[in-house]
Regions:
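Bacterial N-terminal signal peptides that target proteins for export
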Residues: 1-8
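Short N-terminal segments immediately surrounding and downstream of signal-peptide cleavage
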Residues: 22-37
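Short, linear, compositionally biased motifs with a strong N-terminal bias
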Residues: 12-13, 64
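Short N-terminal leader segment in a subset of presequences, especially plant chloroplast
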Residues: 10-11, 30
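Alpha-helix initiation/capping motif
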Residues: 13-14, 79
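N-terminal signal peptide c-region/cleavage motif recognized by signal peptidases
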Residues: 14-20
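Absolute protein N-terminus
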Residues: 1, 20-22
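Surface-exposed, polar/charged faces of alpha-helical domains
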Residues: 33-113
Length: 113
């Protein structure tokens, strides 16, 4: 009986720890300006924000890795937790790639004027 309860409680604890982990997805608090219209000062300011956002995303991904490392692979629900973790990780990479493409377009447009 105790073993059965333990098997029910452990996954709940694991999911709960993932749900309440301190891995907060960083918010992108800026818009990439139009390179054709932006001033040099605006572009330099945005470059700093882009770099900070990339650094924040790297911290987020490290946090996800650290949280997953705390969970035993022996846990019955480990594969599902690992899958959710990978989805969050990959989504942050895709967001960073989209932002980098947008920034690259703005820089090329700025340099072409």
């Amino acid at each position: 009986m105790f073993k059965k309860k333990l098997l029910i409680i452990l996954p709940l604890i694991a999911f709960g720890s993932m749900a309440f982990a301190e891995c907060n997805y960083p918010k992108k608090k800026f818009d990439v300006p139009s390179g054709k219209k932006a001033s040099e000062a605006e572009m330099v300011e945005t470059m700093g924000k882009v770099k900070q956002f990339q650094a924040d995303l790297a911290v987020y991904r490290t946090c996800l890795d650290d949280e997953l490392a705390k969970i035993s692979p022996e846990l019955e629900s480990f594969e599902e937790i690992e899958k959710m973790n990978a989805q969050k990780y990959n989504a942050s990479v895709e967001d960073e790639q989209r932002m980098a493409e947008e920034w690259g377009e703005a820089v090329r447009a700025f340099k072409s004027k």
